[in-house]
Amino acid sequence: MSLDIVILAAGQGTRMRSALPKVLHPVANKPMLGHVIDTARSLQPQSIQVVIGHGADTVRERLAADDLNFVIQAEQLGTGHAVAQALPQLSAERVLILYGDVPLIETATLQRLLALVSDDQLGLLTVELADPTGYGRIVRDDSGVVQAIVEHKDASDAQRQIREGNTGILAVPGKRLADWLGRLSNSNAQGEYYLTDVIAMAVADGLTVATERAADEMEVLGANDRIQLAQLECHYQQRMARRLMAQGVTLRDPHRFDVRGQVSVGRDVTIDINVILEGKVVIEDDVQIGPNCVIKDSVLRKGAIVKANSHLDGAEMGEGADCGPFARLRPGSKLGAKAHVGNFVELKNAVMGEGAKAGHLSYLGDAEIGARSNIGAGTITCNYDGANKFRTVMGEDVFIGSNSALVAPVMLGDRATTGAGSVVTSDVPADTLAVGRAKQRNIEGWKRPTKK
């Protein structure tokens, strides 16, 4: 059966106390609405309608995509009114209504919900709540059949004792929706057009209201303030930690680990505390990541080791390579197999060949370093002249003496050597020693200045 999805994202979110529209507040570095859109896409609908209102231009600009249609709700008159704004765009056999501030809803849950929908049956997602305050209550008859949803403010004392709450997520037969929305009334405590009133209409029209239960409260929690936003973040991170551990990853402490993107992992990976994985990260078998590391949009090949307090962004580490502690690999950096980058070494758009080493205290930018070459402490590639960047190219088995400055553009042939403290401004042929420093002069009988 064909499917249209409507995502309600027009709310202001005053309790966030923020100029940013509520649905753009992030969970795991992605807007809450972005998570919901990703889940919607996984269901392969024929259209996704996003109903926006408060901060509409900002929301549209942030999340615009070819497969999204944004619909304006000029006045926030309730959830039923919001869905009605999208009606002209809906033509599928089934319509699923989601919420832009409920980012943890799972694809599998929604698939089960959609399986309930037929011409004479709709699907309602409910949840068992420890404290249902504020939630609409699911009212059933003596045989357990759903009769209506009663909003908290309109509920009687007896109805407020019900712990089964409405999540707001609803899947309905598309051909029925326009009729139901057209019959909504705002005669209630809020003076709004409640989407939940559709349930009583469906029952009156002879349809069955089938229910699917969410796994837990967190899956359907919406973020109305920053406290709930933090709860969502914590739950998301624990969910990701469990998934990675199930795939063969050892997390030293799952409560001190963050995923903020897409992560692919191999087996027997070990990750220490306070590690952040951002963007698209690929981690192969037997990789070890030390504490306090940030790894973004990077690839770690089999057996790579990232030592404590290192930062990788857009980098690739070859099989058996290692870096750190306190290493920084910036975009375009690539370490060959068994290459070594030590403490306080920064690479930017630099490629190190197999077995090459830069042990400590160096900046290597816009550079190509051949296999087995050794970079002495304090080496700098001087790649910027104030207007343009230039490359430094080293062959294989090159030895760079400590505290050398390589002024690009410059090339060093295979097995070239530079003396410690040299400033290299021209190419060095293969098998050649380059020494570029002032001759030492000793002054005998030198007396240090004294204070006056």
Swiss-Prot record:
Pathway: Nucleotide-sugar biosynthesis; UDP-N-acetyl-alpha-D-glucosamine biosynthesis; N-acetyl-alpha-D-glucosamine 1-phosphate from alpha-D-glucosamine 6-phosphate (route II): step 2/2; Nucleotide-sugar biosynthesis; UDP-N-acetyl-alpha-D-glucosamine biosynthesis; UDP-N-acetyl-alpha-D-glucosamine from N-acetyl-alpha-D-glucosamine 1-phosphate: step 1/1; Bacterial outer membrane biogenesis; LPS lipid A biosynthesis
Example of a GO biological process term: lipid A biosynthetic process
Cell location: Cytoplasm
Record's catalysed reaction(s): alpha-D-glucosamine 1-phosphate + acetyl-CoA = N-acetyl-alpha-D-glucosamine 1-phosphate + CoA + H(+); N-acetyl-alpha-D-glucosamine 1-phosphate + UTP + H(+) = UDP-N-acetyl-alpha-D-glucosamine + diphosphate
UniProt keyword terms in alphabetical order: Acyltransferase, Cell shape, Cell wall biogenesis/degradation, Cytoplasm, Magnesium, Metal-binding, Multifunctional enzyme, Nucleotidyltransferase, Peptidoglycan synthesis, Repeat, Transferase
Record GO terms (molecular function): glucosamine-1-phosphate N-acetyltransferase activity; magnesium ion binding; UDP-N-acetylglucosamine diphosphorylase activity
Cofactor(s) in the UniProt record: Mg(2+)
UniProt cofactor note: Binds 1 Mg(2+) ion per subunit.
Binding positions for UDP-N-acetyl-alpha-D-glucosamine per the UniProt entry: 8-11, 22, 73, 78-79, 99-101, 136, 151, 166, 224, 330, 348, 363, 374
EC number: 2.7.7.23, 2.3.1.157
Enzymatic class: transferase
Chain sites annotated for binding acetyl-CoA: 377, 383-384, 402, 420, 437
Source organism superkingdom: Bacteria
Keyword field contains Metal-binding: yes
Pyrophosphorylase as annotated region, ranges: 1-226
Pfam family, one: NTP_transf_3
Region (Linker): 227-247
Residue ranges, annotated region (N-acetyltransferase): 248-452
Active site, per annotation: 360
Primary localisation category: cytoplasm
Residues the entry annotates as binding Mg(2+): 101, 224
One GO CC annotation: cytoplasm
Subunit comment: Homotrimer.
Role, per record: Catalyzes the last two sequential reactions in the de novo biosynthetic pathway for UDP-N-acetylglucosamine (UDP-GlcNAc). The C-terminal domain catalyzes the transfer of acetyl group from acetyl coenzyme A to glucosamine-1-phosphate (GlcN-1-P) to produce N-acetylglucosamine-1-phosphate (GlcNAc-1-P), which is converted into UDP-GlcNAc by the transfer of uridine 5-monophosphate (from uridine 5-triphosphate), a reaction catalyzed by the N-terminal domain.
Family, as annotated: In the N-terminal section; belongs to the N-acetylglucosamine-1-phosphate uridyltransferase family. In the C-terminal section; belongs to the transferase hexapeptide repeat family.
Protein's UniProt name: Bifunctional protein GlmU
Lineage: Bacteria, Pseudomonadati, Pseudomonadota, Gammaproteobacteria, Pseudomonadales
